[in-house]
Regions:
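Long, highly charged, low-complexity intrinsically disordered interaction regions
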Residues: 1-63
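C-terminal extensions
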Residues: 16-17, 21-31, 35-40, 87-135
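Short acidic/polar active-site loop segments enriched in Thr and Asp
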Residues: 17, 162, 198
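Conserved hydrophobic/aromatic pocket- or pore-lining residues that grip, position, or stack substrates
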Residues: 129, 166, 201
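Divalent-metal-activated hydrolytic enzyme cores
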Residues: 139, 186-219
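Short HxH-centered metal-ligating active-site micro-motif
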Residues: 139-177
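Alpha-helix N-cap and loop-to-helix initiation/capping positions
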Residues: 176-184
Length: 219
């Protein structure tokens, strides 16, 4: 690979996946500032925030405090993030069959990992494990969401779901499930079994991490 290529030319020749985080960010930023070319600015920004994830997760005040980037770049990045979220949701909606959890995990992380309050979300699936709809059923405080199994089952029956996937975030950033997380998962599973609905998984979303009950054989 020709290391002398500028990021945009490198992308056109080899594809976006061949670029480093700094090169991708340089394309996004487009220009540098006085005495700091765009590639150096990109590296400075990544060093300041720790990673692309750290940059994307930054709030407006944190983002704009970094020399060389400001409100325009913040708005553009928020728009890009939202477009990515909608793209992933569209991928799920368009007859997506849940034979692999990779797209699901990516979507759930985009949807939940940067929220300040705990959100309990449910994906409702048909008998071929295709998405019928998703619902944010419960919104909690900074560290707790009140989840009622009967409401989950009520929604599942209303849309004739054959299976469900549960997900919630931990605003603390730690993806390890709590004792109450395990309790509510078991309660929903037992309630679902009474009406022949399968609980396929329960994802706990943290900062850059997740926990899958199914992957850990807890369902």
């Amino acid at each position: 690979m020709d290391e002398a290529l500028m990021p945009r030319e490198k992308l056109l020749k080899y594809g976006a996946a061949a670029l480093t985080d700094a090169e991708l960010l340089a394309i996004f930023l487009r220009t540098g500032i006085k005495d700091c070319p765009v590639m150096q600015l990109s590296k400075n920004v990544l060093q300041h925030f720790g990673s692309l994830r750290g940059l994307i997760s930054a709030d407006q005040k944190q983002f704009c405090a970094m020399k060389g980037i400001g409100i325009t770049q913040f708005i553009q990045l928020q728009a890009c993030t939202e477009m990515t979220r909608r793209y992933l949701l569209a991928e799920l909606k368009e007859g997506y069959c849940f034979s692999s959890s990779d797209v699901v995990k990516m979507y759930l992380q985009t949807e939940l990992e940067n929220t300040e309050r705990e959100i309990f979300l449910v994906l409702f699936l048909d008998n071929q494990h295709r998405l019928i709809k998703q619902e944010r059923l419960f919104l909690g405080t900074i560290n707790k969401a009140m989840v009622y199994p009967r409401e989950v089952i009520k929604e599942a029956l209303a849309c004739n779901a054959a299976a469900i996937i549960l997900a919630h975030n931990h605003p603390s950033g730690v993806a390890e499930p709590s004792f109450s997380d395990r309790q509510i998962t078991e309660a929903i599973k037992q309630a679902a079994e009474l009406v022949e609905i399968r609980v396929l998984d329960h994802f706990v979303i943290g900062k850059g991490d997740y926990f899958s009950f199914a992957e850990q054989n807890l369902l």
